[in-house]
Regions:
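Aromatic-rich, lipid-facing transmembrane alpha helices and their immediate juxtamembrane interface loops
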Residues: 1-168
């Protein structure tokens, strides 16, 4: 009953939106169009994942792969609230900031972008597990969760970072 119910919207949405806009406009002002596009690609990947998450629920009639539990200012989709969408809008920008300038630099024979994608994906999985342990994120499928973190890693986050770095 809270899905897209605007009666729950709080004032903190306004400063959060301004932070996201500030980050993007600062990058544009610095001429970092590639970073802005990478951030939007990362954010777009989240929307893609949220759509297939909803389709899993729709066609299975059982449960989404992940769902939001607890308080939120605005629940946009079953697995996406306004706080998370703002976070993902900034995460793609942040994920490009520590990259080496040399796109072809390799570590142990593997392109550095794949290393960064793997490390950030693993960190993101750890954050998801903490959110799940805190009861803020619900998982109901055996192939997605603490006992199967590879689903979250390979389907949930690695594509986000890979697309972000490909665009960048």
């Amino acid at each position: 009953a809270v899905l897209r119910d605007t009666s729950h919207v709080s004032w903190m949405v306004i400063p959060m939106l301004l932070v996201v806009l500030y980050v993007y406009f600062m990058e544009l002002d610095r001429g970092n169009t590639g970073r802005v596009l990478a951030g939007l690609a990362f954010w777009g990947m989240d929307w893609f994942n949220e759509i297939w998450n909803g389709l899993v629920f729709h066609f299975s009639g059982h449960a989404p792969v992940w769902g939001i539990a607890g308080d939120t200012s605005l629940l946009l989709l079953m697995g996406l609230n306004i706080e998370i969408t703002f976070m993902f809008a900034i995460t793609g920008i942040m994920a490009t900031m520590g990259l080496p300038k040399d796109k072809k630099l390799k570590w142990l024979g593997v392109n550095n972008r794949w290393w960064f994608a793997a490390v950030f994906s693993a960190l993101s999985v750890c954050v998801e597990m903490m959110l799940n342990a805190a009861g803020m994120l619900v998982w109901d499928w055996p192939w997605w969760g603490r006992s199967a973190p590879w689903g979250i890693f390979f389907l949930g986050y690695l594509p986000f970072y890979a697309v972000c770095y490909w665009v960048y």
